[in-house]
A protein has these predicted regions:
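Structural alpha/beta core scaffold segments of enzyme domains
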Residues: 1-317
Length: 317
């Protein structure tokens, strides 16, 4: 049932874990399936105008819809017009071609009359897209001084019944794993797996929220295991200014991680509360924590993304 597998290696993981005195920390971390729950459900209309089919669609990807409708109907793309109005939310769910080809096909088979497909909330949950549930297994080998010697990730992404955006979400998350806390020796494997569940597709963050949840939960586990303050542990291991990822070529240009942590600690009175909330007992307990989040736009080099522009100059330049 494996749709796709991505592996990423840096250094020599097996040799690194033989370093004397290392502390091994491992754990499983899961994120659930989530539906986008945008206010406006999917809706589209189709009507023939001469030899052309004109569609109004609540979509995020009008150009891709045009191509897919043309391919599905076996007609030139130039005979398909997609009009995208302001939509009532999408958050990635409408970044897929959903019902437009069906709506267009019904229209053509009814003599070109106006056809509308208006999907109820129940069908949105079952037959649209959801966020990938991802289960991650992370192993870290840490020195007593709080630095990483080696790290390993295995991530299993629940794709549901159909491919949709497929493995790009899992691959994006796997690609982020070695970036937030750089390490010289890393092994990472990501598996996207078909299941008999609603199809997973794009949703805000595109795999990074699932990855960062796992990484940051694990980071707290590591800090607790070696007896180090979780903020100090993060500051020690976060990507430094000037860091460039070998795979994606992403580069960190400024020290915003530490700046954000400083402001967050000041705003929440973190240090006082962190000490006060230690060693509590009873049914009601208070706690305070902090996590950081690493996200970069687009999915390069997992996938090639393009854009275009048109420039018109006056005679005077």
């Amino acid at each position: 049932n494996i749709l796709k597998h991505t592996d990423m290696k840096k250094g020599d993981y097996q040799a690194a874990i033989r370093e004397p005195g290392l502390i091994k920390v491992e754990g499983w971390y899961s994120t659930p399936t989530v539906q986008h729950c945008h206010i406006e459900n999917f809706i589209c209309t189709a009507q023939m105008e001469g030899e052309r089919i004109r569609m109004l669609s609540s979509t995020q990807i009008p150009h891709i819809v045009r191509r897919v409708v043309g391919q599905a109907l076996g007609i030139d793309w130039g005979r398909v017009q997609i009009i995208k109005p302001y939509i009532g939310g999408g958050f990635g769910n409408k970044q897929d071609v959903l019902y437009e080809p069906l709506c267009a096909w019904v229209c053509m088979n009814l003599g070109g009359h106006l056809v509308k497909l208006d999907v109820p909330r129940e069908e949105t949950f079952v037959s649209n897209r959801v966020r990938h549930a991802i289960r991650s297994h992370i192993v870290s080998w840490v020195r007593p001084d709080g630095t990483f010697a080696a790290r390993k990730l295995e991530a299993f992404s629940d794709q549901g019944a159909y491919a949709s955006h497929g493995h790009s979400i899992c691959a994006k998350g796997v690609g982020a794993f070695p970036q937030l806390y750089p390490c010289d020796n890393i092994e990472a494997d990501g598996y996207t797996v078909f299941t008999n569940k609603p199809t997973a597709g794009a949703m805000r963050g595109y795999g990074i929220p699932q990855a960062m949840w796992a990484v940051e939960c694990h980071t707290d586990d590591v800090a607790a295991k070696i007896g180090m303050d979780p903020i100090a542990f993060r500051r020690k291991n976060l990507m430094p200014v000037g860091f460039q990822d070998e795979f994606s070529k992403n580069e960190l240009y400024s020290d915003t991680f530490n700046q954000c942590m400083d402001k967050g600690m000041a705003a929440t009175d973190y240090e006082r509360k962190y000490k006060e909330y230690q060693n509590q007992t009873g049914d009601i307990r208070r706690g305070i924590g902090m996590s950081v989040f690493w996200y970069n736009t687009a999915v390069w080099p997992i996938s090639l993304e393009t854009s275009s522009c048109r420039m018109v100059l006056n005679q005077d330049g």
